[in-house]
């Protein structure tokens, strides 16, 4: 998929000051999927409220890819941080990880395009992100707003 406004939004948002460390903390501490967080935030920017059923559908279409591709590549890249002279290899793995995340977001965007639409809401960001946090299953996920 060549045109994906979700991916464009995610790249722009991730580059903002403070966003990357906050996203990584939410990922590492609470087990939240940063791509799903960006999806919720992107929908909020469009003034669309994320529903439980819609999020469950998104999770269903990305779960295998995330489990089989994205997470193993991330773990592999993180293990290569322990090898001091392997920056080139680590960068290649990071590139593959980003391509896998792009594919995940392409799948998410395709799901969005195929959905019946989401209800309009004025400033639904907090609600959308709280719903994503509740899907993580982490007992303290409700506190993620502090990060």
Regions found by a protein language model. Give the residues of each.
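A charged, amphipathic interaction segment
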Residues: 78-147
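N-terminal interaction modules that seed assembly of large macromolecular complexes
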Residues: 21-59
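Short alpha-helix boundary/capping elements
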Residues: 31-35, 43-48, 66, 98-104, ...
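N-terminal intrinsically disordered, cationic/polar leader segments
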Residues: 71-72
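A non-catalytic, amphipathic alpha-helix used as a structural packing/dimerization or gating element
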Residues: 57-68
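Short amphipathic alpha-helical segments and their helix-coil junctions
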Residues: 6-27, 113
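Short, low-complexity, intrinsically disordered N-terminal peptides in bacterial proteins
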Residues: 1-6, 145-147
């Amino acid at each position: 998929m060549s045109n994906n406004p979700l991916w464009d939004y995610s790249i722009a948002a991730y580059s903002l000051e403070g966003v990357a460390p906050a996203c990584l903390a939410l990922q590492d501490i609470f087990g939240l999927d940063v791509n799903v967080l960006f999806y919720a935030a992107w929908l909020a920017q469009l003034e669309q409220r994320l529903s439980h059923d819609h999020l469950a559908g998104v999770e269903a279409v990305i779960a295998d890819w995330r489990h089989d591709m994205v997470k193993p590549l991330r773990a592999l890249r993180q293990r290569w941080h322990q090898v001091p002279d392997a920056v080139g290899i680590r960068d290649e793995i990071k590139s593959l990880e980003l391509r896998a995340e792009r594919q995940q977001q392409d799948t998410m965007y395709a799901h969005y395009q195929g959905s019946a639409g989401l209800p309009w809401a004025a400033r639904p960001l907090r609600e959308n992100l709280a719903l994503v946090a509740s899907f993580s299953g982490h007992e303290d996920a409700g506190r993620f707003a502090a990060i």
